[in-house]
Amino acid sequence: NAINMSCLIRREQITKQLKQLKRKQRTVVGTPDRINDHLIRKSLKLDRAKFIVLDETDRMLDMGFGIQIDRILKYIPKERQTLMFSATLPEQIVKLSKKYLTNPERVSIGKTNVVAQNINNEIIKIKKEDKYKLLLEQLDNREGTILIFVKTKHGTVKMAKNLSHDHFASEPLNGNLRQNKRDTVMRKFREKKFRIMVATDIAARGLDVPHIEHVINYDLPQLAEDYIHRLGRTGRANSIGSAVTFVSSKELGKWNEIQIMLDPSLKKSNSKNSFSKS
């Protein structure tokens, strides 16, 4: 049977959505900003809602939707079932779950600590001040589409600007982009209008562009699990992918965390070594 559903997103005309809501749909799917618009207009009522699903919660928080989510949840009865999906569990997610979930059960699905065998993975230990020079060399020596990961939203803009100045056409992808701008950037990237994208972890979540041939980890991720997500952006559909990771001296601690995630036995050997030295 078909599911009666309203889709509430900012890039669509609100008049079309108002018509949908008048049909009293059982299911509402939408972005936090537009759902709030309808709650304020009173065109959407959630006082009888029994289920709420927060999908890609970490990405929504990274895009600044935390306050919007708070407002929405105030309209929903406390007696409800809440499902929260997130690829990572940063501190913000933990706080949100404690605030809104009652006796929650955590479910982890699939192995997250395995690098696909069809991805050629290279690690380069380097001084922080030499990273950009090495990046330019890597871009010169690599053909095809490239996805570069940096730590911050501001960093994506700065990096894309610097690369374009150095004759490497590139665009930033981060949580601050409006949906229409993100759609434009993604369309051009898929159409190979430019070959280099600079992204944050959250903004690139779920990115499925088959022709990405190389991933460059300019900065290490804040969460070890994101290392696997990054490498998964290349080598799609069993094609051969390539990844290179820059590791500066200040990032060695974080790199050790990533190695232990990939091979938990390293944790035991490290603890034995530290015990014998003490």
Each model region followed by its residue ranges:
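Conserved helicase RecA-like core
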Residues: 1-278
